[in-house]
Amino acid sequence: MLLLKQISPPFHLHQLRRRISTIISAGFTLNLPKLEPSSDAELISQMLITNHNPFHFMESSLQLNGISLTPNLIHQTLLRLRHNSKIALSFFQYLRSLPSPSTTPTSFNLIIDILGRVRQFDVVRQLIVEMDQTSPETFLILVKRLIAAGLTRQAVRAFDDAPCFLENRRFRLVEFGFLLDTLCKYGYTKMAVGVFNERKEEFGSDEKVYTILIAGWCKLRRIDMAEKFLVEMIESGIEPNVVTYNVLLNGICRTASLHPEERFERNVRNAEKVFDEMRQRGIEPDVTSFSIVLHMYSRAHKAELTLDKMKLMKAKGISPTIETYTSVVKCLCSCGRLEEAEELLETMVESGISPSSATYNCFFKEYKGRKDANGAMNLYRKMKNGLCKPSTQTYNVLLGTFINLGKMETVKEIWDDLKASETGPDLDSYTSLVHGLCSKEKWKEACGYFVEMIERGFLPQKLTFETLYKGLIQSNKMRTWRRLKKKLDEESITFGSEFQRYPFEPYKR
DNA sequence: CTAGGGTTAG
């Protein structure tokens, strides 16, 4: 892979062939294990990226390497190209052009998702019409990407039109629930309720659908509406279950303001009320219920209350999960009680739960607050040495830490690690980096990453754009600005008011 | 994609 990287764009087949045979012979002498499909995919996608789509070489180089394009390998390659929509599409078209086309429904759905992320809906529609590989999932993916792009009306229309493409396989309640859930997750709860009311006769309704809508109102901090829907649900004869109540509980606890002590106490009472109501209906609160409350105590930095509550739940015979422990660890870290947090890590391990990157991120967050570069680097090294795989969020906190400290060399080092990691940079990574570079007045570099993030399908925040724009104009970098402007026109991106509405993707687990 | 909890954020 490294050897392939070194071949720069005007390259020749014999060059590529020589490199590949070097790799193969190196493999023999070093006795490397046989390539797995995933590392083959790594090789292919790397080849595609660094050599700017050498499709005319692909077949011969694949043959040389003894690789055959299995459906799984195609899928893996597309996965690795998911942030490079243009190359991914070229690869996909290449697959279609082969004598025996090797696209599968799975790879088809993946390319639809990749294109949807960069809002290439015209291409998506064209592919759906041209190819006969459309499954119900294809439409659900399209629906999700349309909603993510703020095109909710089109999303509902795509949902309605789907049966025409699916030999009249009708969507049922599950798919309807997905539509509503996606609308809610991206903040379009009102629209979801509208759609629900229009079609509840057709699709029916169950506790899941109501839970989705209640969660939607909670997301908008409309607890009053959430409670109204709970009442409506019970009135229409649908029994809420533990998930429904947990959603409501989370709505109350998550966004609850904790500042003046009275408000915090009022929220605690509200949460207790939900617990009481649950028990009245014969539903026992579960680990999730307790974790939600623990999280609220943790946000309020109530270390003692958090620890007591955890004891209480253990006494009730409910075993904490990794989420529960992480909440408590977060609380201890944010109270500066790092030693106790470390002790809790040991307790976790003893009870058979190994900390995740999310757990360790609490420590990184505290190091960031303390501007403790050594603490952060030590833990980071331990993680790299096999303690636990850092997540994108881990990298993001680290980036923030060293940007704040002005240590741009370390930032570069972490960025390279992040680039090489499995998941790669996300919207937040790019945002931090671009803002960091802007604060150092490295406008051209910032601009480069800004363009890169767009190419990878991340929609920058309006603030990021404005910061960069002001910097470029003030420092008279008109040529860079014009290049950027051209890019934005090409991708038809404008930073109007509508862009403030969906700066983030909903969190996925 | 498949109703819910932990990490992140100028």
From Swiss-Prot:
Cellular-component GO terms for this entry: mitochondrion
Transit peptide: 1-19
Ranges in a coiled coil: none
Database matches in InterPro entries: Pentatricopeptide_rpt (IPR002885), TPR-like_helical_dom_sf (IPR011990)
UniProt-listed Gene3D superfamilies: Tetratricopeptide repeat domain (1.25.40.10)
Localisation per UniProt entry: Mitochondrion
Primary subcellular site in the record, as a coarse category: mitochondrion
Residue ranges of PPR repeats: 172-202, 206-240, 241-285, 286-320, 321-355, 356-390, 391-425, 426-460
Disulphide bond pairs: none
Organism superkingdom: Eukaryota
Family: Belongs to the PPR family. P subfamily.
Identification of the protein by name: Pentatricopeptide repeat-containing protein At2g13420, mitochondrial
